[in-house]
Amino acid sequence: MFHDIDVPHDTRGDDSPVLSETPFLHEGARVVKSRLGSWTEIGKNTTIVESTIGDYTYDDGDVSIFYSEIGQYCSIANRVRINPGNHPGDRVTQHHMTYRRIKFGLDTQDDEEFFAWRRAHPCVIGHDVWIGHAAVILPGVRIGTGAVVGAGAVVTKNVDPYQVVVGVPARPLRSRFSDSVIDRILQSRWWDWTRPQLEERWRDLCSLPTFMEKYAP
């Protein structure tokens, strides 16, 4: 279930809330024209603009997410940047006064073509993805389900499901599981379990052999 959220400024605060179907926004969170799933938690001073966040996904604060689609059960660490702003390197000046013209009193309209390009290059992140502290996901990048992005990584290219990437620019380090196990987990689509199914089965997610035997034979 998604909730349409447009809360430019939120002042709620609780360091350890008990989550519910209603998205929880910590103090200073700003969510603009976005859709948040149930059991989601938006950290302190996080900004989310024109994005979709799936059920059970959370961030740890000071995160920036623009024009992105993020799946369910994702874990986003502190200070992550997803689809950060670009600058027009083909212009004489890269300064944003050339496209944020209203702010600098230069025009009555901003450069909508510039912003349209950014919207046309969304980041798409699968389910159960862990993004480490201060990682940056550049515009247009797709990250597969189950992937891990190491702390401080700058992701410039697509990441395969269940792949671990690290470094600047990010490069593959290893896969979390064998190809056959990855295929079977993907086919199980456990992230689509209903709430009653999750309450009944969540312990099985703690053991790969048990999970594979029951849900991904």
Task: Outline where the language-model segments fall.
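Acidic, glycine-centered active-site loop in nucleotide-sugar glycosyltransferases
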Residues: P161, V166-P169
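A generic "structured core" feature
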Residues: G144, V148-G150, V154
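C-terminal segments of enzyme domains that contribute to small-molecule binding surfaces
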Residues: M1-D10, H26, H95-I137, P169-P217
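Short-chain dehydrogenase/reductase
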Residues: W130, V148, V164-V165
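Flexible, glycine/small-residue-enriched loop-and-beta-strand segment within the central core
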Residues: G13-D15, L19-P139, V168
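Short, glycine/charged-enriched secondary-structure capping and boundary segments
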Residues: G89-R91, Q163-V164, D179-V181
